[in-house]
């Protein structure tokens, strides 16, 4: 009662309070405001953007040290950003990419490095085909209802990789594929969850590709502008440095309290923060047991994002685009992309330190990380110019107390089938957004927009402003960034796996042996 009186006396009465000023929370608030709903956003940091963050200084002009990439089929973020007046540009892949493996560099073009060993090729082909086929069985909006959900959720991705792959090279690349896509280790994540994650991003090729894939484009001026421009539209309805510590929905209205003991009264709440961070909030009444158990079981991925700036794009002298896939346990960086500005100015290479490597290298001083990265680039690109950067930026997302890591929360084995179905189920008058609750491109900015707008429409439905059938809306394809259908050749669809080839050889050998025995028997009977 005392909290309610404080909130009312301060005039802090709203229809909806949104917890979290990232893209998901702000896209929810924007939609609510457009429907003449009195909304307030409470953000813990001194900035908006959440896991997107555009740093600006004289050395870089602007740089995305958090989420940055958009591409075809990510139609919601493309629509929203266009509405906000933002433009995209394509990440440079005009020159060749480089694969670094076993101490040697191999230039290539396309989404995946080529495989010349015929046995390894069969293994790689079967890996991608099997993962995509398994994903087709998993409903994007309810992975726990997949026919093999229980079986696959008991397995780690390491278990599945070991089961599918015959060759060491395929197993190692599959492990790297997990590291790159979800910033965690194959032994940490549920096979069901990872297969779902890849499926809802459009499959193995779409999620991993630059051209026609999830990394095709960036925003001119940085992705942080999405949140910043929504904040400009909302004005004083966004409050920074207001970490929420208490949510009381035991009375007629909900009381939300912040760390500085401000109180706000509302009818509904949207939680648009990573699931694990809701453990920082005290709830009255307590969260239901399944929800409480879920938020304790969804760790965040580990990543340090690193941008190395040079006087010139020296890698282009060798017809390299700046994108590298690095398979080396001692290498700090696992994958890179060109991070130069759209006009080619401020040449830079962006690299990810991922999963176990992020944990290991976080212990070093920043200058030592910089040195190790430069030495790696010199080796992979075959140029001493890599040792002479003019500037270095990095962001260790693991040390962010209001993110806990990046890109996204992951599901360890057994959690999806046991608790996953409550991920976006409302708790009383509290609704849940955040990219983790999305059904398309979860983990990306696209998923954040989907989740935020869906949560907003759920509340608009409760307020009688939106029909129930309009809570989940299909998004039209972007006309500016159309998707090209991903197709597979006859051989990619039909080549046997290594195991299948061995069975064919074994069967053929048996038939041949049987034919020889029969032939010799006939010769004997004739004589």
Curated annotation (Swiss-Prot):
Its EC number is 1.4.3.21, 1.4.3.4. The record marks 335 as: Important for substrate specificity. The keyword Mitochondrion applies. It catalyses: a secondary aliphatic amine + O2 + H2O = a primary amine + an aldehyde + H2O2; a primary methyl amine + O2 + H2O = an aldehyde + H2O2 + NH4(+); (R)-adrenaline + O2 + H2O = (R)-3,4-dihydroxymandelaldehyde + methylamine + H2O2; dopamine + O2 + H2O = 3,4-dihydroxyphenylacetaldehyde + H2O2 + NH4(+). The modification Phosphoserine is found at residue 383. Keywords: Acetylation, Catecholamine metabolism, FAD, Flavoprotein, Membrane, Mitochondrion, Mitochondrion outer membrane, Neurotransmitter degradation, Oxidoreductase, Phosphoprotein, Transmembrane, Transmembrane helix. Residues 1-497 are cytoplasmic. It comes from the Eukaryota. The modification S-8alpha-FAD cysteine is found at residue 406. Belongs to the flavin monoamine oxidase family. This is Amine oxidase [flavin-containing] A. It comes from Equus caballus (Horse).
